[in-house]
Amino acid sequence: MPTSVVTGGAGFLGSHLCDYLLARGHRVICIDNLVTSSLTNLEHIDDDDFVFVNHDVTDPIEVAERVDFVYHFAALASPVDYLRMPLHSLKVGSYGTHHALGLAKFKRARFLLASTSEVYGDPQVHPQPETYWGHVNPVGPRGVYDEAKRYAEALTMAYHNQQGVNTGIVRIFNTYGPKMRSHDGRAIPNFIRQALANEPLTVYGDGSQTRSFCYVDDLVRGLVLLAESDEHLPVNLGNPGEFSILELARTVLKVTGSKSEIVFEALPVDDPQVRQPDITRARQLLDWEPEIELEEGLRRMLPSYGREPVGV
């Protein structure tokens, strides 16, 4: 039985990953300090092969038993969180990644860094391949997250090149699904919360900016495929289907049956105008392709908000 350590395992993505690994017969050690996550995401797990450890990864990580995989997902990924705790965001990206890599080195485990499409910033190349270096403002408000991930990637490559650690890097594009916090600060949970409360849906800017939304089940499947490969260069994982934020808002209204209106507010500083993954590398290396389209994913997500989708 393989043993996997998942840092940030009580968060949105991390908890889905824990579920998937347990279903595949892994022993899972979940490490989280619960600052931005919740044990509610794990309370359904009743498995002797699951262990939860309340620990901050900015402190050294110690695991007594054998470890085969280290999935480093600890991060302040929500704008609400990294804008409120900018220094902690940078520390998790630096100290936290260093400690997770140190664990993988000591245990001779395969390491997978959860990086992000935010390393591309406000891209001037579209769609974004892994070879694109990005267009990022390091001193803007988003820099505390973007640069934390860019540094984490550099640190991961340094451990691979100098220390021989078996590492992988996944650049995750906008992902959604059950267990997202309703006040997460990201478009999909914001729109669903507003629609179900019959409040106006807040679109920033004119809504023409685009994103590509990947359902969490598709993403997690790709994560494990990448972890089980020997690829050490970054790999994009995301759904290449591209939607404007205004299209997203209208789709949420359709799925929820809400009569809410759409209102427009000023675009935040450094908000990217476009975001779409080039997943050629994932297709070629992993034979991975997302399967769940946006409207279907939103319908699957709604019951977690206590509401059934309309028009089913």
Regions flagged by a language model, labelled:
Residues 10, 117, 179, 207, ...:
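Acidic beta-to-alpha connecting loop that harbors the catalytic carboxylate
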Residues 84-85, 179-184:
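Short, solvent-exposed loop/turn segments at secondary-structure boundaries
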Residues 126-127, 182-190:
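A glycine/serine/threonine-rich, flexible loop-to-helix segment
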Residues 1-175, 217, 223, 292, ...:
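N-terminal Rossmann-like NAD(P)+-binding domain of SDR-like oxidoreductases, especially those catalyzing
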